[in-house]
Amino acid sequence: MASALEQFVNSVRQLSAQGQMTQLCELINKSGELLAKNLSHLDTVLGALDVQEHSLGVLAVLFVKFSMPSVPDFETLFSQVQLFISTCNGEHIRYATDTFAGLCHQLTNALVERKQPLRGIGILKQAIDKMQMNTNQLTSVHADLCQLCLLAKCFKPALPYLDVDMMDICKENGAYDAKHFLCYYYYGGMIYTGLKNFERALYFYEQAITTPAMAVSHIMLESYKKYILVSLILLGKVQQLPKYTSQIVGRFIKPLSNAYHELAQVYSTNNPSELRNLVSKHSETFTRDNNMGLVKQCLSSLYKKNIQRLTKTFLTLSLQDMASRVQLSGPQEAEKYVLHMIEDGEIFASINQKDGMVSFHDNPEKYNNPAMLHNIDQEMLKCIELDERLKAMDQEITVNPQFVQKSMGSQEDDSGNKPSSYS
């Protein structure tokens, strides 16, 4: 092994033993070029370091190995990274979260290129757990995990990292990019859409769209298109975006989504035949955007919406009559829709098979059972927790030096602008 590499190994051992992690981070940041020049010796360096005791040194070597234009032996490197992420020291890693996250991004890209996304899911879950200070902290690796789960069509492993509300972002020594934030909410929205959890999907797309921005992001544009479609499926109309949404959404993103706005406009007429014509007219756009499946669900949701409207007018109705009023192909299709809607709790009805009549009923829920009271208690606890968190954030801002300086400056401006009472 070259003497410079020996010195690197000795320094890593010494600084790790002394617990001087900040100096060790400085060393590994400076050593990238040295390690890159000695690629053939890097496995020897790995052999001289202990993954648990010298985690930052091993991280530096693996990062450089993965950074090379071509990886000569991917399987060996994959095994080394897998072993490292599962056994490394989490406390040490948190000093170099930028490099650790970078290694995870490299692994993700390599698996995506090789069309092997499933292999990385378990590894990235371990990586997130090592990086996070708490379960409500968002890291850039969350987006990688969601991407692999989407490509592998294996959604459930991502849910524990999506079902929690994020309160904090891991700064990753300044390396955290807005792209990772947008991708987490965009991919998360797609996962929830695939699982038909449309309420949560809508929230995730909204987070991506309302991210403060000065320029158009392609991720925001695609989120906006899906936001319109999911909004129609879930609510029967496009939910208005919050007032704090960036102006670029109205100025640039909306004009780039004309086909989707037309779809929403026609949807509001409650006319399925017109909606089918519009879908046919813009089918190329919807297919190119990979949104045709959602568009078809919009058409299906319009039939359901029209059936729900019938429940407000009729107590009983024949399946044949329902099919003609809702523009379905016949009583069989009407029966299929009604049964699905009863199963999903969207309507309360029963079908008499003898005469093909549908009887609509009132909602049997009286909101007085223990389960409902428990739900109300849980929602109240969430509100109390949110109130406490807002108070803590308010206090944090109040004592922030930048905020104090700015508020004092504005007060001085105000007092300077006031006319003197003696003039």
UniProtKB/Swiss-Prot annotation:
Pfam families: COP9_hel_rpt, CSN3-like_C, PCI. One of its GO terms (cellular component) is cytosol. The modification Phosphoserine is found at S407, S410, S423. Widely expressed. The keyword Hydrolase does not apply. Residues 402-423 are annotated as: Disordered. GO terms for biological process: in utero embryonic development; protein deneddylation; regulation of DNA damage response, signal transduction by p53 class mediator. PROSITE patterns: PCI. Its main location: cytoplasm. Disruption phenotype: Embryos arrest after 5.5 dpc and resorb by 8.5 dpc mainly due to increased cell death. It is found in: Cytoplasm; Nucleus. Keywords: Acetylation, Cytoplasm, Nucleus, Phosphoprotein, Signalosome. The modification N-acetylalanine is found at A2. Transmembrane segments: none annotated. Component of the COP9 signalosome complex (CSN), a complex involved in various cellular and developmental processes. The CSN complex is an essential regulator of the ubiquitin (Ubl) conjugation pathway by mediating the deneddylation of the cullin subunits of SCF-type E3 ligase complexes, leading to decrease the Ubl ligase activity of SCF-type complexes such as SCF, CSA or DDB2. The complex is also involved in phosphorylation of p53/TP53, c-jun/JUN, IkappaBalpha/NFKBIA, ITPK1 and IRF8/ICSBP, possibly via its association with CK2 and PKD kinases. Belongs to the CSN3 family. Component of the CSN complex, composed of COPS1/GPS1, COPS2, COPS3, COPS4, COPS5, COPS6, COPS7 (COPS7A or COPS7B), COPS8 and COPS9. In the complex, it probably interacts directly with COPS1, COPS4, COPS8 and COPS9. Interacts with CK2 and PKD. Interacts with the translation initiation factor EIF3S6 and IKBKG. Interacts with ERCC6. This is COP9 signalosome complex subunit 3. It comes from Mus musculus.
